[in-house]
Amino acid sequence: DLVMLPCYHWTRCLLVPKGHPLEALERVDIEDLARFPLVTYTFGFTGRSELDSAFSRAGLEPHIVFTAIDADVIKTYVRMGLGVGVIASMAIDEKEDTDLVKLDARHLFQSSTTKICFRRGIFLRAYMYDFMSLFAPHLTRDMVDKALTMKTQYDVDMLFSDVELPVR
């Protein structure tokens, strides 16, 4: 039984080499994206299920040619011309990735939420509380302790429903 505490939301972007046909579009839609091979995260890791859901909602099937658990591997595949990358927007390094073009995909895919999880009933040491509050400032010791008193994950989610999480 896990307690899952929300930390921040994150969004996806598309990554293409300079000169790619998608770069010329003012706004990429899901039908445009479906015309190209995709390189993205492994299913069940880092929000891949949201990509599949977005295509499913449009009645389309994504053409995924490679998957990886690491954004840098995906960037390498994009650089090799193997497909359009679909990665977390925060994985782009403005200094290192100057050969690639980042295209907004917030309108295509719902954001995901990064959470800190731990087993219910675990003894949380002071350094664990410290880490949580450093990683996500709204996860104060009081809030974490309140979450621990909740009986269900739904109750935990409701506890944090008024907290405005940052977007990264």
Predicted feature residues:
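Active-site-adjacent beta-strand anchor residues
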Residues: 15, 40-41, 67, 85, ...
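Hydrophobic hinge/microswitch elements
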Residues: 44-101, 151-168
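Flexible hinge/capping segments at coil-to-helix
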Residues: 2-38
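Residues that form or flank phosphate/diphosphate-binding pockets in enzymes
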Residues: 24-25, 42, 49-50, 126
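Beta-alpha-beta core module
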Residues: 1-11, 25-26, 72-121
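C-terminal effector-binding regulatory domain of bacterial HTH transcription factors
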Residues: 89-97, 107-168
